[in-house]
A protein has these predicted regions:
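Acidic-basic catalytic patches of nuclease active cores, encompassing PD-(D/E)XK
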Residues: 1-38, 47-100, 221
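Accessory beta->alpha helical hairpin/"wing" motif in late/C-terminal subdomains of nucleic-acid enzymes
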Residues: 99-110
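Non-catalytic C-terminal interaction segments of nucleic acid-processing enzymes
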Residues: 12, 18, 26-28, 39-54, ...
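Amphipathic coiled-coil/heptad-repeat helices and related helical stalk/stem segments
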Residues: 81, 103, 128, 151-152
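Conserved catalytic cores of phosphodiester-cleaving nucleases, focusing on short active-site segments
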Residues: 10, 34-40, 114-122, 142
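Nucleic-acid nuclease catalytic cores
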Residues: 124-125, 139-173
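Catalytic core segments in nucleotide and nucleic-acid processing enzymes
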Residues: 132
Length: 221
């Protein structure tokens, strides 16, 4: 078995359960094998750039700013600032009048639901646990997925101390060996970006298609 086979088996499980997910989500601090989401607003604006969301958050907080204010805050060149601001304007989130930028729509009260990341490994459960901890910066919960025959080698205390959950994979079946603990370091902007990417890749997956699954306890009601 290859790690790709393990990931494909998990993907199959998620598809059968009607769960929205994305593979190899690149977040700068790591690439999670699988990131899934429950309950996020399906009309989430597709913002996948950290500076783009950060600038929007800054404008939203100040209500109106100048291009110069943004330059000073983010240490960006004027052309780059204009590029970001015009992108936000095209999305209908800000308006521009001369050099003044005003907020139009507040996206920071939108429901992001629950985001869960999974790191899949065949044997290196220690390395996987360390990687999974990084994903807590943009996920509410994080798991390591291992083949069922590898589970016997795992020191569960390491997972319990770090708050990382553990999944046993046998074929296309998943068993939760240890539940994950909620992240205390999940950053809203990073979560928005990761959730945005998952929603964008799952426009045809609807909540009513959900089936009972090992992650059901994390579904927001």
């Amino acid at each position: 078995m290859l790690e790709a086979d393990l990931v494909n088996n998990i993907n199959h499980y998620l598809e059968m359960k009607g769960i929205r997910y994305s593979n190899e989500l690149r977040m700068g601090i790591g690439i999670s094998d699988i990131t899934l989401n429950f309950g996020a607003n399906r009309r989430l604006k597709p913002l996948d750039d950290y500076f783009l969301v950060s600038i929007l958050a800054y404008v939203n907080k100040k209500r109106k700013v100048t291009f110069f204010d943004i330059q000073e805050m983010f240490l960006l060149g004027l052309e780059k600032v204009k590029q970001y601001v015009f992108t936000l304007a095209n999305l209908g989130l800000v308006v521009i009048k001369n050099t003044l930028v005003k907020i139009v729509k507040n996206i920071f009260s939108v429901n992001l639901g629950t985001t869960i990341s999974i790191e899949a490994k065949l044997k290196d459960w220690k390395g996987a646990c360390l990687q999974a901890q990084r994903y807590l910066c943009f996920s509410d919960y994080s798991y390591v997925a291992l083949p069922s025959e590898t589970i016997k080698n795992v020191d569960l205390s390491i997972f319990q101390e770090s708050g990382i959950g553990l999944l046993s994979i046998k074929g296309k079946n998943i068993e939760e060996i240890l539940p994950a603990k909620e992240s205390v370091s999940c950053d809203y902007i990073l979560k928005y970006i990761s959730t945005s990417k998952v929603i964008e890749k799952n426009v045809d997956v609807e909540k009513r298609h959900l089936r009972a699954n090992v992650f059901t306890s994390y579904i927001l009601t």
